[in-house]
């Protein structure tokens, strides 16, 4: 465990209580703990949340390495740019229902989109986000 704490930059803070850690520091500890028993299935909820850029890059590489070792990784994320770089297969939900389940490349091809965000927009038909943003600014300025 000592070596793991050094690798993720928490060695100097190893004696601090978990409550004293930042969200990103807690996230690193929880991710390490989830790997300790070498699970075949790893379930992560928003694993990139709260991580600094370097830690997120390490996690992305770690997830790729785990997948290469035939580990199944199931994780939720609202950050589509990260999902696009990490996930082999995605499941897109709209109001609790599955609207797509395929590889990122296949979804982009079928939907004629260059990004996962474009696929998501087509499949979920979200509200006009630009109009909402402008309305918020109008209300705040008033």
Kindly label every feature range from the protein language model.
Residues 83-84:
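A short, surface-exposed alpha-helical micro-motif characterized by mixed small hydrophobic
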Residues 101-102:
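ABC ATPase "signature
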Residues 42-45:
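Catalytic Walker B motif of ABC-type/P-loop ATPase nucleotide-binding domains
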Residues 57-69:
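Helical segment within the ABC ATPase nucleotide-binding domain
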Residues 53-55:
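Helix N-cap at the start of a conserved alpha-helix in ABC-type nucleotide-binding domains
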């Amino acid at each position: 465990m000592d070596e793991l704490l050094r690798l993720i930059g928490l060695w100097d803070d190893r004696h601090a209580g978990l409550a004293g850690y930042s969200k990103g520091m807690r996230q690193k500890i929880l991710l390490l703990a989830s790997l300790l028993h070498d699970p075949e299935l790893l379930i992560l909820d928003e694993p990139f949340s709260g991580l600094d850029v370097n830690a997120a890059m390490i996690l992305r590489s770690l997830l790729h390495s785990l997948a290469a070792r035939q580990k199944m990784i199931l994780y939720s994320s609202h950050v589509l740019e990260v999902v696009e770089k990490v996930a082999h297969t995605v499941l897109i939900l709209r109001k609790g229902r599955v609207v797509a389940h395929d590889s990122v490349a296949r979804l982009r091809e079928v939907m004629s989109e260059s990004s996962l965000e474009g696929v998501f927009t087509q499949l979920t038909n979200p509200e006009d986000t630009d109009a909402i943003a402008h309305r918020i600014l109008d209300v705040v300025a008033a």
